[in-house]
């Protein structure tokens, strides 16, 4: 099998892992609190990745450690939003709303760095706003709490992307080592928060053990390894389009595994949001969306 085809199939599989993560996160809530679950997940991923990339870690610079710590702290905000968002909204909504960082990122760059976005951003934002309203407002005129939390998660993702983009552009920063440090810092912060605000405990039932291990091994650890080793074998635009499939996969998982059924209006909204993501990715975020799931 050609390297490009194999790489793209593995990246599609990785996207599937991320899509299923929303469902398994909700399953884990029956026995684990949110902070404890994230600590378990990220520390497991760190201890999986550290031996794989030990050569990178041995030779990493001070700048690499510094930026790994900064991005790891920001990633905590991302996953606080993602985890609690899943808890208080539908899996389908969480999947679509949490992926909006690809559109939010250029807005952050415009505000913070005065970097002019592409002209099609306005069209993408309009489509996305209409789609978000159709998806989330239902029969009322306000967001559910979980929808708002997921939107805050997307904003945090946007900040994570911008910071990561600036960090890896520095010649003294090793992106792989930085990402492993990032995951370790995220796990350590979540563990500290869990001891402060929760009563950390390990899963009790085999079902929850399986779900938690899947999140750590496949959705965080293995997914990162696949992304960093395989995306170089295909075009960045194709990688971005593959990752745009995540909200669609999330909706399919929610339909078949969780039995979620959306109003036809919500499906129209989801389609508009998906189209806005594709519009942005056709020749836009070569780095944007590649970075949005870095280490997740």
Spans of features found by a protein language model:
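Glycine-/small-residue-enriched transmembrane alpha-helix faces in small-molecule transporters
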Residues: 1-36, 73, 140-166, 188, ...
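C-terminal-most transmembrane helix of multi-pass membrane proteins
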Residues: 4, 9, 41-43, 50, ...
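Specific transmembrane alpha-helical segments of multi-pass solute transporters/efflux pumps
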Residues: 17-22, 50-98, 106, 134, ...
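Membrane-interface helix-cap regions at the ends of transmembrane helices
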Residues: 20, 24-27, 31, 44-61, ...
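Helix-helix packing/entry segments at the starts of transmembrane helices
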Residues: 38-40, 94-100, 164-187, 220-256
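Transmembrane alpha-helical segments that form core, pore/gating elements
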Residues: 46-49, 105-106, 142-200, 212, ...
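C-terminal transmembrane-helix exit sites in multi-pass transporters
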Residues: 48-58, 82, 101-123, 248-268
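Hydrophobic transmembrane alpha-helices of multi-pass small-molecule transport proteins
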Residues: 49, 69-70, 75, 117-137, ...
């Amino acid at each position: 099998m050609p390297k490009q085809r194999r790489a793209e199939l593995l990246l599609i599989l990785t996207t599937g892992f991320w899509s299923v993560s929303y469902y398994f996160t909700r399953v884990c809530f029956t026995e684990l609190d949110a902070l404890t679950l994230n600590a378990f997940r990220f520390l497991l991923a760190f201890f999986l990745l550290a031996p794989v990339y030990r050569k990178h870690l041995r030779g990493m610079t001070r700048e690499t450690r510094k930026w790994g710590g900064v991005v790891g702290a920001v990633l905590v905000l991302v996953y606080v939003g993602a985890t609690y968002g899943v808890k208080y909204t539908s899996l389908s909504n969480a999947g679509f709303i949490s992926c909006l960082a690809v559109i939010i990122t250029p807005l952050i760059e415009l505000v913070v760095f005065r970097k002019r976005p592409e002209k099609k951003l306005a069209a993408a934002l309009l489509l996305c706003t209409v789609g978000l309203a159709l998806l989330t407002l239902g029969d009322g005129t306000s967001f559910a709490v979980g929808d708002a939390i997921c939107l805050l998660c997307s904003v945090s993702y946007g900040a994570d992307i911008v910071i990561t983009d600036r960090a890896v552009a520095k010649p003294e920063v090793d992106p792989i080592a930085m990402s492993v440090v990032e995951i370790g810092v995220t796990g350590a912060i979540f563990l500290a928060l869990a001891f402060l605000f929760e009563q950390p405990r390990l899963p009790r039932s085999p079902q929850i053990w399986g779900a938690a291990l899947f999140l750590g091994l496949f959705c965080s650890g293995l997914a990162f390894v696949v992304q960093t080793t395989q995306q170089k074998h295909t075009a960045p635009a194709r990688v971005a389009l593959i990752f745009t499939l995540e909200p669609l996969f999330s909706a399919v998982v929610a339909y078949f595994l969780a039995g979620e059924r959306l109003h036809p209006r919500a499906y129209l909204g989801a389609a508009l949001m998906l189209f806005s993501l594709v519009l942005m990715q056709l020749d836009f975020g070569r780095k944007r969306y590649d970075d949005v799931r870095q280490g997740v």
